[in-house]
Amino acid sequence: MAPQLLLCLILTFLWSLPEAESNVFLKSKVANRFLQRTKRSNSLFEEIRPGNIERECIEEKCSKEEAREVFEDNEKTETFWNVYVDGDQCSSNPCHYRGTCKDGIGSYTCTCLPNYEGKNCEKVLFKSCRAFNGNCWHFCKRVQSETQCSCAESYLLGVDGHSCVAEGDFSCGRNIKARNKREASLPDFVQSQKATVLKKSDNPSPDIRIVNGMDCKLGECPWQAVLINEKGEVFCGGTILSPIHVLTAAHCINQTKSVSVIVGEIDISRKETRRLLSVDKIYVHKKFVPPNSYYQNIDRFAYDYDIAIIRMKTPIQFSENVVPACLPTADFAKEVLMKQDSGIVSGFGRTQSIGYTSNILKVITVPYVDRHTCMLSSNFRITQNMFCAGYDTLPQDACQGDSGGPHITAYGDTHFVTGIISWGEGCARKGKYGVYTKVSNFIPWIKKIMSLK
């Protein structure tokens, strides 16, 4: 009986096995879905290791919280996370004028230096004319706490309040033909060095110099005027200021009995083509001190106030080859123009110290020389109405016959008269500079004379 009972129990157990298996084990499809995961959990060893950004966020994709655990600093976490999510928005250096860029998610923020604003710090807040000339193309003045721009005669202020728009084709200071050529054709600026003290000269030369200049092509020096004496000879230069006014040096006027003017010429040997313009009146500054005069020996100095204006009988006809230079304001000339590297001088004077005058108009660029160096270089008094320009070692200068001619300084595309060729000690001598009448000191006088009927 016992063996039969044991057999029944074994059969019953074997019959129940398939049902038990189906209750304990899931089907493979369901089991795979249940066990699927995207990231394994850190092992106990990993959890106790110090945070490592490469392990947490480079080898695997991490969350912001995991990054924070690594840096343990909110600011560092934000900086990392902004780049981690969508790249560095500051990599292209979008902030202008040395602004500081801070990356964000899908954006960036620029922190601007004082006087700058805008998303990219691209807008300059010009609250002073001393900062970039107040962003003015021509003249700047301070009105209350802001800057106000204005333009030279024959220009209109642009709608942006900064630019200057020429009213006509022949507005002052426009060098149409040379605009894209001047930089390539003129010598590079040469830094002046300390002047060499030379043996004392007996007298300053009343007419200074264009030595080793370049030919000025037709229309590239359109403000150049030439003064002709009663013999038909060139004896001085001048600067066209208006249809009826030519600026020149006072010492030129007492060199001849009569004066005629030529404009628009670059080759004065062709007498058959040149047209002499008649002079109506000449205004010489009443304080001008001629050389070897009574006043020179008392309390004034030779060639001080060396300025004169010629009034024409008939208006000068402007063209591409004949354009007046712009007259600056006194502040603009002193604070902006005369702080440029260099100016431009031109003329038909001697090409060597003892050479002949040139039939071809010559032009050179001459660097401004600081006043202290200027005074050390000369054996003669440099007054407040004078300034120096030129090279102390490079043999380039103006020379006899150039006197009265233009010293021009460009600002942007506009050319302003800044000086009058006045005097020098020889021509292109080592350690010596050309001396020019400082036009900025005479703006009121010039305007007064030009306003006379």
Swiss-Prot record:
Record-annotated disulphide pairs: C57-C62, C90-C101, C95-C110, C112-C121, C129-C140, C136-C149, C151-C164, C172-C326, C216-C221, C236-C252, C374-C388, C399-C427
GO biological process, alphabetically ordered: blood coagulation; induction of blood coagulation in another organism; proteolysis; venom-mediated blood coagulation
Substrates-to-products reaction catalysed: Selective cleavage of Arg-|-Thr and then Arg-|-Ile bonds in prothrombin to form thrombin
Cleaved signal peptide residues: 1-20
Annotated PROSITE patterns: ASX_HYDROXYL, EGF_1, EGF_3, EGF_CA, GLA_1, GLA_2, TRYPSIN_DOM, TRYPSIN_HIS
Residues that bear 4-carboxyglutamate: E46, E47, E54, E56, E59, E60, E65, E66, E69, E72, E75
Propeptide boundaries: 21-40, 182-209
EC annotation from Swiss-Prot or TrEMBL: 3.4.21.6
A single cellular component GO annotation: extracellular space
SMART domains according to UniProt: EGF (SM00181), EGF_CA (SM00179), GLA (SM00069), Tryp_SPc (SM00020)
Major enzyme class: hydrolase
Glycan attachment positions: S92, N254
PANTHER family, per the entry: COAGULATION FACTOR, COAGULATION FACTOR X
Family of this protein: Belongs to the peptidase S1 family. Snake venom subfamily.
Name by which UniProt lists this protein: Venom prothrombin activator notecarin-D2
Species name: Notechis scutatus scutatus (Mainland tiger snake)
